[in-house]
Amino acid sequence: MKIVWYGHACFLIKTKGVSILIDPYPDVDEDRMEKVDYILITHEHMDHYGKTPLIAKLNDAEVIGPKTVYLMAISDGLTKVREIEAGQEIQLGDVTVKAFYTEHPTSQYPLGYLIIGDKRVAHLGDTYYSPSFKNLRGQVDILLVPIGGRSTASEREAVDIVDIIRPRIAVPMHYGTYGGGSAEGFKRELQRRRVWVLVKDLKPYEGFEV
């Protein structure tokens, strides 16, 4: 499995012959992206949906997201669009995607995604801490967790989320663009709280394989 962070909450996940892009924000550089088959959107806010129409058309990719995203994509002239709800499970080739509710009060239908391929990756979109995340414990190898603290988890709340889910690897996101937070601050808070996890501190357009 290959995971690339394109900045903000935007990631590319390549596994089992499938390329999945998540939350392409307005400033992401589509010219630096690999080919994508599917675009998963966690919710309707423009810092997560931004370049979806352009990238979908360039790649002939299917867009998948909650009801508001479905309606936005249709209104933008996209035809390969699928709606997904919390609790629903779909197959993208040999990859399983499970949608779950996240705690983002300013969104109508906020979702996170558990992507099951060679490894299990959870993308939390925009979220605060939620006790319901305990349901993910034991299911997540790599956690993509927001730390920026602007309408989403702060560094401290992100540690609470890591502590309740207990992944093997945590990748901080949703910082350095809109809002505060830093990977170093997140790592310091993990150490201070004695929450042990391997942190992948990526630079935009940098990736790793697991």
From Swiss-Prot:
Q: Which family does it belong to?
A: Belongs to the UPF0173 family.
Q: Which UniProt keywords apply?
A: Hydrolase
Molecular function GO labels:
hydrolase activity
Lineage, top ranks = Archaea, Methanobacteriati, Methanobacteriota, Thermococci, Thermococcales
PANTHER family tied to this protein = METALLO-BETA-LACTAMASE DOMAIN-CONTAINING PROTEIN, UPF0173 METAL-DEPENDENT HYDROLASE MJ1163-RELATED
This chain's protein is named: UPF0173 protein PYRAB01190
What is the originating organism of this protein? Answer: Pyrococcus abyssi (strain GE5 / Orsay)
